[in-house]
Design a protein with these regions (language model features):
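Small-molecule-sensing regulatory modules
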Residues: 2-46, 51-54, 58, 66, ...
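Short, well-ordered beta-strand segments
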Residues: 7-9, 81, 99, 129, ...
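Short, small/hydrophobic-residue-rich motifs at membrane-helix boundaries and re-entrant hairpins
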Residues: 17-21, 62, 75, 85
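Short, structured active-site "lid" loops
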Residues: 54-80
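Structured loop/turn residues at beta-strand edges in well-structured enzyme cores
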Residues: 76, 124, 182
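Short, Asp-centered acidic motifs that coordinate Mg2+ and/or phosphate
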Residues: 78-82, 185-186
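A conserved helix-loop-strand patch within extracytoplasmic ligand-binding domains
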Residues: 85-88, 94-146
Length: 348
C-alpha cells in the first residue's frame, strides 16, 4: 500500500502549528482506520495577520488570518486548511466550504495574572492586556477601574508581558522573542489556545459566559477544502467532524452575519446542546457591549432539534435561524446604539 501525502495549509504561529498538527494526527488516524496509509504534511503560509504589527481592531479582524490560506486552497497549492473558526469571515467563498469542525475545546476566556490573582483581586488601576474590543468592553463592565492595553503577538509573547509569569522557550518562541518585558498585571486569552499549547497551568481565572461571553465559534477549528473534493479525502475528513460543535458554531456565526458585524466588533456568543427527552435543544446566548463597559444588550434563545442525528441539514437550518433570531432581538433592544457595529466592520 503506497503512502498518500495530504498537504495541510496552516499559519506559522506556535498555536496554529499546534492546532494543525493535532488535526493532522486525527486525519492520519481516521485514514488508517479505513485501511489507508496517509501522511499529512503541514504547509506553512504567512498571512497579513502574522506580518502586520497593527492592532487587530485596526486591521479589522475580518479574515486577516485567512485570506492567504484560502488563496492557496483555491490555487490547489494545499489540499485543506485549518483555521480558528472565529478568524473566518461569515460570508462564504465561492469554490470553498467547511468540510469539518472537530470537537470544540473550552470556549471560555481566561485571565493570566501576576501571582495567580483573579480579576477581583487585581489592584485598582491594574493594566490588563488584550487585543479584543469584545474583551475590553466586558472587562470594563466587570472592573471599570482597570486600564486595558492593546496587545499583539503570539500567545507565549503575550504571556511573557505579565509580571511574574515565566514562559519556557519550548512553548513556541525563543526567550529573545518574548516581547518588551513584563509590564502588565494580567492578560486575557482564550482557554483553548492556552490548553493546546500546554500553557493552561498559567490560567488564574476562567470567565464563565455570564461574566464574559466568548467570541463567536471560539475554541472551534474549521477544516476548509475546495468545494469539489476527492471523495476519499472527503470521507476521511468527515470522520473527524463533531456535529454538536458544528451546530454551535453555525448558530453563533449567524448572530455575527445578521448583525453585519466584523470579527473586531464587541459581540459575544455562546451556544451549546442539551438533551431534552428524545431530542436535543440548542441554546444560545448573545450580547453586544459598549466599549466603555457602561451598557450592553443580551439575548437568550433556544431551538428544539428533533431526533438524534445531528448531521441533518434541517438542524443546520434551525441553528442558523436561532442565531438570526438572537441577532434580531439584540437589534430590537438597541444593539446599534450600544456599539457602532457598522463602523467596526468598515475598519477591516
Amino acid at each position: 500500500m503506497s503512502e498518500k501525502v495530504v498537504r495541510l495549509g496552516t499559519r506559522g504561529s506556535a498555536l496554529a502549528l499546534a492546532q494543525s498538527g493535532m488535526v493532522a494526527r486525527m486525519l492520519e488516524t481516521a485514514a488508517a482506520a479505513q485501511g489507508m496509509d496517509w501522511r499529512v504534511e503541514l504547509v506553512t503560509v504567512r498571512t497579513q495577520g502574522d506580518t502586520s504589527r497593527a492592532a487587530l481592531s485596526q486591521l479589522g479582524g475580518i479574515g486577516v488570518f485567512a485570506a492567504q490560506l484560502r488563496t492557496h486552497l483555491l490555487e490547489g497549492q494545499v489540499d485543506l486548511a485549518v483555521h480558528s473558526f472565529k478568524d473566518l469571515p461569515t460570508a462564504p467563498v465561492t469554490g470553498l466550504h467547511i468540510a469539518a469542525t472537530p470537537r470544540r475545546a473550552d470556549p471560555r476566556d481566561a485571565l493570566v495574572a501576576s501571582n495567580g490573582m483573579s480579576l477581583a483581586q487585581l489592584p485598582s488601576g491594574a493594566s490588563v492586556g488584550t487585543g479584543s474590543p469584545r474583551r475590553v468592553a466586558q472587562l470594563k463592565a466587570l472592573r471599570p477601574d482597570i486600564k486595558t492595553v492593546d496587545l499583539r503577538g503570539n500567545v507565549p509573547t503575550r504571556l511573557g508581558r505579565v509580571r511574574g509569569v515565566q514562559i519556557a522557550a519550548d512553548a513556541g518562541t525563543s526567550p529573545q522573542a518574548l516581547g518588551t518585558g513584563a509590564d502588565l498585571d494580567a492578560v486575557v486569552l482564550a482557554c483553548a489556545g492556552l490548553e493546546r499549547l500546554g500553557l493552561a497551568k498559567h490560567i488564574s481565572e476562567a470567565f464563565n459566559p455570564e461574566q464574559m461571553l466568548p467570541a463567536p465559534s471560539q475554541g472551534v477549528l474549521a477544516i476548509e477544502t475546495a468545494q469539489e473534493l476527492d471523495p476519499q479525502l472527503e470521507a476521511v475528513i468527515a470522520q473527524v467532524n463533531d456535529p454538536a460543535s458544528h451546530l454551535a458554531a453555525v448558530a453563533e456565526r449567524a448572530v455575527m452575519s445578521t448583525l453585519q458585524a466584523g470579527c473586531a466588533a464587541p459581540v459575544g456568543t455562546y451556544a451549546y446542546l442539551v438533551h431534552a427527552g428524545f431530542d436535543y435543544e440548542l441554546h444560545l446566548e448573545a450580547g453586544v457591549f459598549a466599549l466603555d463597559g457602561a451598557a450592553s444588550v443580551r439575548s437568550r434563545q433556544a431551538a428544539t432539534l428533533g431526533g438524534v442525528d445531528l448531521t441533518k441539514a434541517c438542524h443546520l437550518q434551525k441553528a442558523t435561524e436561532l442565531g438570526q433570531r438572537a441577532a434580531q432581538d439584540l437589534l430590537a433592544q438597541g444593539a446599534g446604539q450600544v456599539a457602532d457595529l457598522q463602523a467596526v466592520k468598515e475598519r477591516g
